[in-house]
Amino acid sequence: MRILQLPALRDNYIYLLHDPETATAAVVDPTVAEPVLDKLAELGAELVAIFNTHHHHDHVGGNLQLLARYPRAVVYGSQADRGRIPGQTVELQAGETVAFAGRQAKVLFVPGHTRGHVAYYFPESGDLFCGDTLFAGGCGRLFEGTPEQMLGSLDQLRQLPEATRVWCAHEYTLNNLKFALTVDGDNPDLQARYQQVVALRQAGSPTVPSTIGEERRTNPFLRWDQPALRAATGAQDPVRVFARLRGMKDQF
């Protein structure tokens, strides 16, 4: 399974999963249809699945146009997003699996950013498509969920193997790390990562994917149990630490 990263709009990433052996493809969170259609034509591949992480328009905006061209494609999304994902044909629950290219992806229920957010984790290849729950160096805003829900979702992702590649849906890394330095500035891993990200962005290169290990070492939203983050927030309870961090980031 090849993973092709397609930039869209200002800072979105669409992910096209390609199986050369069967000339089929699946897409994760098609912001818009055009770059997906162009790449499918270039590859000579048929779209067989759309994996949506949540209902926001910049993640489902291309669904219907893709279905017009590939009407047999199956559209996956959370059961909690029923009626909110265009063209949805399969309603997923936590613990279910979906398949592509002979590989099984676990459906992880990760509410917080939205009430129905899911992530798709391919354990065999070590790839996580987490939408707007976990970002490189950050996490999604809480539009529909609670701090308790988001903390539980991030803790679930934090426990995945360190080598897991994190394919998040936005290029927010540089700003996320600028904020991280204000609350965890003495962290040498964070300092080094910031310099690497600055160089990547100056070169016009993506900073995604990262890894779970890298996020555990440098992402403040996965480090709520570290003394530096407790000190920065003036809290000890994990939910309070997280909630205060999220509030600080919202104002950053």
UniProtKB/Swiss-Prot annotation:
Keyword terms, alphabetized: Hydrolase, Metal-binding, Zinc
Gene3D superfamilies membership: Ribonuclease Z/Hydroxyacylglutathione hydrolase-like
E.C. number: 3.1.2.6
Domain of life: Bacteria
Residues that bind Zn(2+) 1: 54, 56, 113, 132
Annotated positions binding Zn(2+) 2: 58-59, 132, 170
Reported cofactor(s): Zn(2+)
Cofactor binding notes: Binds 2 Zn(2+) ions per subunit.
InterPro entries listed in its UniProt record: Clx_II_MBL (IPR035680), Glyoxalase_II_hydrolase (IPR050110), HAGH_C (IPR032282), Hydroxyacylglutathione_Hdrlase (IPR017782), Metallo-B-lactamas (IPR001279), RibonucZ/Hydroxyglut_hydro (IPR036866)
GO biological process: methylglyoxal catabolic process to D-lactate via S-lactoyl-glutathione
Reactions mediated catalytically: an S-(2-hydroxyacyl)glutathione + H2O = a 2-hydroxy carboxylate + glutathione + H(+)
CDD domains to which the protein is assigned, alphabetical: hydroxyacylglutathione_hydrolase_MBL-fold
Entry-linked SUPFAM superfamilies: Metallo-hydrolase/oxidoreductase (SSF56281)
Molecular-function annotations in GO: hydroxyacylglutathione hydrolase activity; metal ion binding
Pathway: Secondary metabolite metabolism; methylglyoxal degradation; (R)-lactate from methylglyoxal: step 2/2
Function field: Thiolesterase that catalyzes the hydrolysis of S-D-lactoyl-glutathione to form glutathione and D-lactic acid.
Family as reported in the entry's similarity comment: Belongs to the metallo-beta-lactamase superfamily. Glyoxalase II family.
Assembly mode: Monomer.
Protein name per its UniProtKB record: Hydroxyacylglutathione hydrolase
Gene name of this polypeptide: gloB
